[in-house]
Amino acid sequence: MPPGCRAALRELPAAKGPAYSYAARLMLIDLHAHTWPRSHDSVLNPDDLIVRAKQAGMDAVAFTEHDTVWDFKSIEELRAKHNFLVLAGVEISTDDGHILTFGIDKYVFGMHRSRELASYVEKSEGVMVAAHPYRRQMPWFSRNDEEYQAALEKASRNPAYQYVQGLEELNGRGSDKENEFSRRLSAMMDLPGTGGTDSHAISDIGKCATYFEREIHDERELIAELKAGRFYAVDLRTGKPVATRA
């Protein structure tokens, strides 16, 4: 984390945690990370990811494997082993793109349809965030303002976006231009933006995160804060927050 970035975050009085001595401060959380073998395209061991995330200044990290949900017992063991908040999520592949989902306990056939996914998430009192919304949407070969605007408007009509509580404005594996498209889309739709590294390797960790205005100790508190919109994306390479809404 760049010098001064953490210092810019307002410290809170020490709090009595429910189970572990998590950092008593406004929180930086990486909301998008993958580990092997639950995500076949990752080379990250869960323990290595946690160690590196702590070194990078994270207060928590969410494991969001592809269409695979971590069981609570394994998550609890990792929390205790590292005295670090690990959150269980899942990245669901739908016909309308990838959706970061929190609050569900299993993958159910049919979740590739965003409407069915949203129905299950609602029943589970969970939350959905659109991952890397620039994918297959951003115009690569045209810098014409009119065509760029048309691409944003087309992306905003994605059927899945009527169900999400936020868009991933900063993706650690996305280029500056790709993330700029996501930021503009987020502003157009008046949706708050998250940040996640989308880590698949050690070198991915620590690039960006989501800054939460209140402390979080578990998935339920994470879901509540996402629904309340009390967060914004932070680029940890520059230390600069990303805010698209007034």
Q: What name fits each language-model region?
A:
Residues 2-31, 35, 39, 43-52, ...:
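Charged catalytic cores and adjacent phosphate/nucleic-acid-binding surfaces used
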Residues 114-115:
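Ordered, amphipathic secondary-structure segments that act as subunit-interaction surfaces
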Residues 66, 131-133, 196-199:
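Short, well-ordered beta-to-alpha junction loops that form the rim of enzyme active sites
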Residues 121-126:
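Core dinuclear metal-dependent hydrolase active-site scaffold
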Residues 30, 50-67, 127-129:
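Divalent metal-dependent hydrolysis catalytic cores, especially in the metallo-beta-lactamase
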Residues 89:
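Substrate-binding cleft of extracellular glycoside hydrolase catalytic domains
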Residues 129-140:
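Aromatic-lined carbohydrate-recognition surfaces of secreted/lumenal glycan-active proteins
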